[in-house]
Amino acid sequence: MSDNNQALKDAGLKVTLPRLKILEVLQQPDCQHISAEDLYKKLIDLGEEIGLATVYRVLNQFDDAGIVTRHHFEGGKSVFELSTQHHHDHLVCLDCGEVIEFSDDIIEERQREIAAKYNVTLTNHSLYLYGKCSDGGCKENPDAHKPAK
C-alpha cells in the first residue's frame, strides 16, 4: 500500500482518485502555499479531470483531518500546505504574494517567555510578517522598490 493511501486511511478518509491526485500535487516542492484555484489549474495541466468544487471539498476534508494547514494571508484567499512539515513562520510580500518560510530560535524563545510572563501554556502559534520585496526582487512589480533615476 502506498504511503498516500495509508495517510488517507490514517486520517479516516476513504482512498479515492481525486484525493490521491490532490495529495500528490501538494507534495510537489513548488506547490506549497497553493490556493485551491492554482491547485485546480495544476491538475488540469497534468491532464486530471477533477472539478474545482471537488478540489475545494477535498482541501476542506484534508484541513479537517490535519493533512494540510490552511493559511489566510493578506489578499483574502486561503492557501494550503502539507501539515507534515516542521514548525515555521512566514514572511509574505504584499505586492507579489511570495511566501518565505523561516524559523528563528530567538523568536520562538521570546514567545515562550511572553507566555510564561502571563502564565499561559502555549499549545500552538502562527506568525505572519508582511512587507514588500526589496531591491527589485518582486515578481509582481520588479521596479516598485528601485530608487528613482
From Swiss-Prot:
One GO CC term, this protein: cytosol
Residue numbers binding Fe cation: H87, D89, E108, H125
Q: What single Pfam family name could you report for this chain, choosing any that match?
A: FUR
Q: Which domain of life is it from?
A: Bacteria
The annotated region (DNA-binding) lies at: 1-84
Question: What InterPro entries has UniProt attached to this entry?
Answer: FUR, Fur_C, WH-like_DNA-bd_sf, WH_DNA-bd_sf
Can you name one GO molecular function term for this protein?
DNA-binding transcription factor activity
Regions that span the bilayer: none
> Where is this protein found?
Cytoplasm
Which GO terms fall under biological process for this protein? negative regulation of DNA-templated transcription; negative regulation of siderophore biosynthetic process
For this UniProt record, the keywords arranged alphabetically read as follows: Cytoplasm, DNA-binding, Iron, Metal-binding, Repressor, Transcription, Transcription regulation, Zinc
Q: Which residues are connected by disulfide bridges in this protein?
A: none
Binding-site positions, Zn(2+): H33, E81, H90, C93, C96, E101
Q: What is its main location?
A: cytoplasm
Region Dimerization: what ranges?
A: 85-142
Its annotated function is as follows:
Fur acts as a repressor, employing Fe(2+) as a cofactor to bind the operator of the iron transport operon.
Assembly information from the UniProt record = Homodimer.
Q: Which family does it belong to?
A: Belongs to the Fur family.
* PANTHER family linked to this entry: FERRIC UPTAKE REGULATION PROTEIN, ZINC UPTAKE REGULATION PROTEIN
Mind telling me what this protein is named?
A: Ferric uptake regulation protein
**Which organism's genome codes for this protein?**
Vibrio parahaemolyticus serotype O3:K6 (strain RIMD 2210633)
